[in-house]
Amino acid sequence: MKTFSAKPAEVKRDWYVIDATDKVLGRVASEVARRLRGKHKPEFTPHVDTGDYIIIVNAAKLRVTGTKETDKKYYRHSGYPGGIYETTFGKMQQRFPGRALEKAVKGMLPKGPLGYAMIKKLKVYAEAEHPHEAQQPKALEI
């Protein structure tokens, strides 16, 4: 029996919607990364993007455990000397709801062209509405 290798043109992608209300950041991120990569499918092939599209709604209502609301820090740099910026999870959720989830999922995906293609299939929305009703997404419970 030959080893099966999925072809990019043969991959069937489904659309799923996840409600992140009162869900823990890391638990949602790990499951989303697994599904974006396609590891839940029997035809998973490491060098082919076999994952599904994931829509996350109510990202503003995501939570973290313990004191991570104030203690978890995110860093970025402007490129200039002394241009480092830091923000906490709580401030990031207020200013850009959903960005913390995007960063968590992106860190769990492969680096390189394949990972960049996978992260484009993630759609995050702060509120309950999303513009992807035409794709008829299935509800996914985590």
From Swiss-Prot:
GO terms for cellular component: cytosolic large ribosomal subunit. The keyword Ribosomal protein applies. Transmembrane segments: none annotated. InterPro entries: Ribosomal_uL13 (IPR005822), Ribosomal_uL13_bac-type (IPR005823), Ribosomal_uL13_sf (IPR036899). This protein is one of the early assembly proteins of the 50S ribosomal subunit, although it is not seen to bind rRNA by itself. It is important during the early stages of 50S assembly. It comes from the Bacteria. GO terms for biological process: negative regulation of translation; translation. This is Large ribosomal subunit protein uL13. Belongs to the universal ribosomal protein uL13 family. Pfam families: Ribosomal_L13. Keywords: Ribonucleoprotein, Ribosomal protein. GO terms for molecular function: mRNA binding; structural constituent of ribosome. Part of the 50S ribosomal subunit.
